[in-house]
Each structure stands twice: as structure tokens, then as C-alpha cells.
Amino acid sequence: MKKIKRDKIVGAGKISNYLLLIIMLGGGISFFIVGFLSYFKAFEHIALFSRFVNSDIRFIPQGITMIFYGTMAICLSIYIYFSIYYDIGAGYNEFNLISKKVVVFRKGFPGKNRLIKFVLPIPHLKSVKVMARGGINPKYEVFLYTKNLSRIPIGQVFKLSKLEYQASEIATFLGLAFEQYNL
């Protein structure tokens, strides 16, 4: 039987984040340019914009609003870019029966607390719990509960069936109780 189990956690470098970055940056730049050009009434002179943009866009209030939304989208895309670059949230969960410790390691933004590492003794753990909230925006999470009722998130977001399997596998490996809680 294996004595060490290590689960890799994927961070912000997912394909969905790359797509979100491209769409948000493209839309933000487009909004910013249209809003900026509305100040100069330059739509009549630029063939590219005259086909796609109504030349009746006034700088106040439409142009200013488009510049604002474009700037916000560009700022959010910069945030997403740095999240991908620094691979925020990536790490691993290591369950070691030899040393009787669980290590939860994650990466964060640069600074004093860039690397987050929890080391928990297995005897202090109480259970592995899956929390599921259904509805329009479902949320599934796996937690390690300690005996003093602190909870440490250890799971990634999967489909519920895969998440339950992962949690039950961890509970069996560590010899802990497995609980499920539906909201």
C-alpha cells in the first residue's frame, strides 16, 4: 500500500482563463478606442470604424462611458494576465502516512506571503467533508476538518461525482470519516 499520496492542484493557468483574458482585452481595447475617437468625431475619417460604429456616438455620455468600461476591462485583463503568469492557486496536497502529516501548499501573488504552506498532523484531523451547493451557480468544495473544527480547503472544482470520489479516496487513505453536506 502506498504511504504517500500527492494531488496536484491546477492554478490560474487554465484554458478558460486564457480565453477570458483574450476576450476581455479585445473588448476593452475596442471600447476604449471607440470612446476615445468619439471625442474627436473621427469615425467619418477612419474606414475601419465607419462600417461598424455609428458616427452619432457623442463623447458625453456615451464616449466617456465607453472609455470607462474599456479602461476597467483592460485593468481586469491585466489582473488575469498576472494571475496566469504567477499561476495563482497552483500547488499540491500531500498526505504522508510515514511522517503522519498533511501538507497543503499553494502559490499566491508576489510579496511576503507568496507561498502558502499548511502542515497538519494527521492525528489532529477529524474528517473529510464535501460541501455542495446547487442552483444556478453550483459550488462544490472539499475540506479537511480538524478536531477544533477548523476547515482547510483542499479540493479543486470538479463535477460533483468526481469530487465525491476524490474526497472519499482521501478519507479512506487517511482513515478519516467522510461527510457530505448539501446546502
UniProtKB/Swiss-Prot annotation:
Q: Where in the cell is it found?
A: Plastid, Chloroplast thylakoid membrane
Task: State the annotated membrane topology for this chain.
Answer: Multi-pass membrane protein
InterPro entries linked to this entry: PSI_Ycf4_assembly (IPR003359)
Instruction: Please identify the protein, giving its name as recorded.
Output: Photosystem I assembly protein Ycf4
Q: What does this protein do?
A: Seems to be required for the assembly of the photosystem I complex.
Q: Which GO terms describe its cellular component?
A: chloroplast thylakoid membrane; photosystem I
The UniProt family comment states: Belongs to the Ycf4 family.
Instruction: Quote the Pfam families the UniProt record gives.
Output: Ycf4 (PF02392)
Task: Give GO terms for biological process.
Answer: photosynthesis
Annotated transmembrane regions: 17-39, 59-81
Q: Which UniProt keywords apply?
A: Chloroplast, Membrane, Photosynthesis, Plastid, Thylakoid, Transmembrane, Transmembrane helix
